[in-house]
Regions:
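Boundary at the C-terminal end of the N-terminal hydrophobic targeting segment
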Residues: 19-27
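Boundary regions of SH3-family modules and the immediately adjacent low-complexity/disordered segments
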Residues: 26-93, 142-178, 222-254
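Conserved beta-strand/loop element in small beta-rich adapter and peptidoglycan-binding domains
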Residues: 41-51, 109-134, 193-215
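Short, solvent-exposed interaction modules
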Residues: 98-107, 118-119, 166-210
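Exported/periplasmic cell-wall-interacting domains
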Residues: 25, 251-253, 277-280, 285, ...
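Bacterial N-terminal signal peptides
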Residues: 7-17
Length: 394
């Protein structure tokens, strides 16, 4: 059996070296897109001379995919996932579920409904707790290094989002991104043809982008061989895209900058012109946009409380304890971890740039005070008039 396969291999090899007499080579016609003849190039021979065969069929398809950067078997290789230990945070968190919730002076006061030292009065409030106790079947949480709250007023938060972006040792050749809203891929761009593949892309799945085209005003991304997704469906953005660029924004003088892309809801981090990290974010939602411009980090805090209100009746007031890995760069606007939601890739903040805890920790460890933050919106939809912006918030 081995001799048989060896013989076949030798015959195929000799066929390419010495074309069989009687079978003519392909003759090109005046039309460069058409040929006459009987021999097609075999797949994976596109890198060799094709003067004796027609680069059509499977060979042409593989050549076209190769030009886009797609090889067979198809592989996705793009950076590395940062250390998962970065997702760990020292605090345990809870959402305050009762209006004007009481904070008691001691555990005994909480048990007996005794002395109240303050109330949590913001409609949207999250606390961090350091200890807990169960007395007579009822649970209590220690907050503020001594104050206590009852479990009736708090809904504990489990593990914050474990989503992490990608770290790089060199700048990728292609753009890439993460799925912000689950979607099914199509065999061709555009909604006019019902050619869905049946393959669902899940939330936060990473994809490569090999080609783009616009159909009916919507940009479509080729993420694999004959596999396309739209940038958005109606108002819902499908993917957060990163387009690597080695050129620093005007004004960056130290080769280090953090690019915040408001259209795609992504961050790209550059060191000496090389992409070193990228991930999804959640920036400010209308009318609390994250302000475009070039800024510098002016303060770093391992954790800090944040509070604010923009409506006169304080109906939108928020209170957030121990916001991790915070870096202020534009008044009250900061880059920081967000433990209270898992909605990265979609605007939802009061102006700050929200990241997962793990991504915020990576960026916090990399960046220093004075490093540049470049915020921009390629779509031009975010206002640039300074009069539109206040101090911002979480």
């Amino acid at each position: 059996m081995i001799r048989y396969f060896l013989l076949v291999a030798i015959i195929i090899f000799l066929t390419f070296i010495f074309p069989i007499e009687g079978i003519p080579a392909v003759e090109k016609t005046s039309d460069s897109n058409s040929v006459s003849g009987e021999i097609l190039c075999l797949p994976n021979t596109a890198n060799f001379s094709t003067h004796d065969c027609a680069n059509l069929g499977p060979s042409a398809y593989i050549s076209r995919m190769s030009d886009l950067g797609i090889s067979f078997p198809f592989r996705v290789e793009n950076g590395t996932q940062p250390d998962q230990s970065l997702t760990y945070v020292d605090f345990r968190y809870g959402e305050v579920t009762r209006e004007n919730a009481k904070v008691y002076a001691s555990l005994e006061d909480a048990i007996k409904n005794g002395e109240v030292v303050r109330r949590v009065d913001s409609p949207y409030s999250f606390i961090s707790y350091y200890d807990e106790a169960v007395v007579d079947g009822k649970r209590y949480y220690m907050v503020d290094y001594g104050g206590w709250m009852t479990a009736n007023d708090i809904s504990r938060i489990g593990t914050p989002s474990l989503f992490q972006g990608r770290a790089f040792t060199h700048t990728p050749e292609h753009s890439f991104g993460w799925i912000a809203f689950p979607t099914e891929t199509k065999r061709s761009p555009g909604f006019g043809i019902d050619d869905y593949t049946g393959r669902e892309l899940y939330h936060y799945q990473e994809v490569q982008i090999y080609s783009t085209t616009e159909v009916d005003g919507i940009e479509w991304y080729m993420i694999g061989p004959d596999e396309w997704i739209p940038e958005k469906k109606e108002w819902q953005r499908i993917i957060g895209r990163v387009i690597p660029s080695k050129t620093p924004p005007e004004g960056v003088d130290n080769g280090r900058w953090i690019e915040v892309n408001l259209k795609d809801q992504t961050i790209a981090v550059y060191d000496q012109g090389q992409l070193v990290f990228a991930t999804l974010i959640a920036s400010g939602i209308e009318p609390f946009w994250t302000r475009p411009g070039l800024f510098q980090i002016y303060q770093k805090l391992d954790s800090t409380p944040m509070r604010g209100a923009f409506e006169a009746d304080r109906s939108d007031a928020y209170y957030l304890e121990d916001v991790p890995w915070t870096m202020y760069y534009d008044k009250a606007r900061a880059l920081h971890g967000a433990y209270w939601h898992n909605g990265f890739g979609v605007p939802r903040s009061h102006g700050c740039v929200n990241m997962s805890v793990g991504d915020a920790r990576w960026l916090y460890d990399w960046a220093g005070e004075g490093d540049w933050v470049y915020v921009w919106d390629p779509s031009g939809e975010t206002p640039t008039d300074p009069e539109v912006y206040g101090d911002g918030g979480a």
